[in-house]
Amino acid sequence: MAQVLRGTVTDFPGFDERADAETLRKAMKGLGTDEESILTLLTSRSNAQRQEISAAFKTLFGRDLLDDLKSELTGKFEKLIVALMKPSRLYDAYELKHALKGAGTNEKVLTEIIASRTPEELRAIKQVYEEEYGSSLEDDVVGDTSGYYQRMLVVLLQANRDPDAGIDEAQVEQDAQALFQAGELKWGTDEEKFITIFGTRSVSHLRKVFDKYMTISGFQIEETIDRETSGNLEQLLLAVVKSIRSIPAYLAETLYYAMKGAGTDDHTLIRVMVSRSEIDLFNIRKEFRKNFATSLYSMIKGDTSGDYKKALLLLCGEDD
């Protein structure tokens, strides 16, 4: 049975964009800022509603809501609120653009987004990227990456994964054998084989291939990837396998490692919490609880502070 996906943020009932715009203006007018009002309001409205509030704010006060928020807020809290205000359909494209911009490339962001988005989502991201930035996402990725890592990203960006249909057992067997021969049984590794199979076969087919692979080789496919590849390609192949197995579980793990140990990767924490809040954050929470000895809520609570913490906990919903 397919998992029913649900977010933690939904449309606010009895929504009134003008009243909300007035609340926000009041929170920022005069001396000091009422952060509590801002975070409570914005985390309880859907992204579409936030865009309506923004429009009402301009109509009522002739001011840009985002500019006002940026000038009143600071630090990680500001970054989180700015992310919440970005139109959903632009958010992934914006994150990818920033991962590709400037001196270094942020491969972590490229890997996470491109590996965990569905073909439909990737097609939408490519279109928005081109409209917003006047260049093709694929061209920008090619210009900023290299080798097999680049090739795998390009294959995924084609968004031509087979649709889920009936399982062809013979094809499952053939792909599992091909992967075994391309990795464990070969001196060196035939990366092309991994890229083609991982990048084009359907999700249900690949899940069967991973099971069959275990039967044939005695290894989980992740163990083979770990042994046979390295660097960015290894990270990307692992992200693809984990996303094929379960996108919420992969993103739960991403959140866990963003907070585990010394220091917090706030960029990742904000990106996943915001981008999934209306899609599958509820499922991510459940996977988090299942796979780690704690809940997402309590980990955020122990790892963050101040208004930033309050806003993240409201996005998270309740403790599991």
Curated annotation (Swiss-Prot):
Sequence position, cross-link Glycyl lysine isopeptide (Lys-Gly) (interchain with G-Cter in SUMO1): K29
GO CC annotations, alphabetized: collagen-containing extracellular matrix; cytoplasm; cytosol; endothelial microparticle; external side of plasma membrane; extracellular exosome; extracellular region; focal adhesion
Positions of short motif [IL]-x-C-x-x-[DE] motif: 314-319
Post-translational modification: S-nitrosylation is induced by interferon-gamma and oxidatively-modified low-densitity lipoprotein (LDL(ox)) possibly implicating the iNOS-S100A8/9 transnitrosylase complex.
Positions of modified residues (N-acetylalanine): A2
UniProt KW keywords: Acetylation, Annexin, Blood coagulation, Calcium, Calcium/phospholipid-binding, Hemostasis, Isopeptide bond, Phosphoprotein, Repeat, S-nitrosylation, Ubl conjugation
N6-succinyllysine modified-residue sites: K290
Covalent cross-link Glycyl lysine isopeptide (Lys-Gly) (interchain with G-Cter in SUMO2) as placed by the record, residue numbers: K29
GO biological process: blood coagulation; negative regulation of apoptotic process; negative regulation of coagulation; signal transduction
Sequence positions bearing Phosphoserine: S37
Annexin repeats: 15-86, 87-158, 170-242, 246-317
GO MF annotation: an example: phospholipid binding
InterPro entries: Annexin (IPR001464), Annexin_repeat (IPR018502), Annexin_repeat_CS (IPR018252), Annexin_sf (IPR037104), ANX5 (IPR002392)
Modified residues (N6-acetyllysine): K70, K76, K79, K97, K101
Notes concerning its domains: The [IL]-x-C-x-x-[DE] motif is a proposed target motif for cysteine S-nitrosylation mediated by the iNOS-S100A8/A9 transnitrosylase complex. A pair of annexin repeats may form one binding site for calcium and phospholipid.
Disease: Pregnancy loss, recurrent, 3: A common complication of pregnancy, resulting in spontaneous abortion before the fetus has reached viability. The term includes all miscarriages from the time of conception until 24 weeks of gestation. Recurrent pregnancy loss is defined as 3 or more consecutive spontaneous abortions.
PANTHER family attached to this UniProt entry: ANNEXIN, ANNEXIN A5
Function: This protein is an anticoagulant protein that acts as an indirect inhibitor of the thromboplastin-specific complex, which is involved in the blood coagulation cascade.
Assembly: Monomer. Binds ATRX and EIF5B. Interacts with hepatitis B virus (HBV).
Record family assignment: Belongs to the annexin family.
Protein name: Annexin A5
Organism whose genome encodes this protein: Homo sapiens (Human)
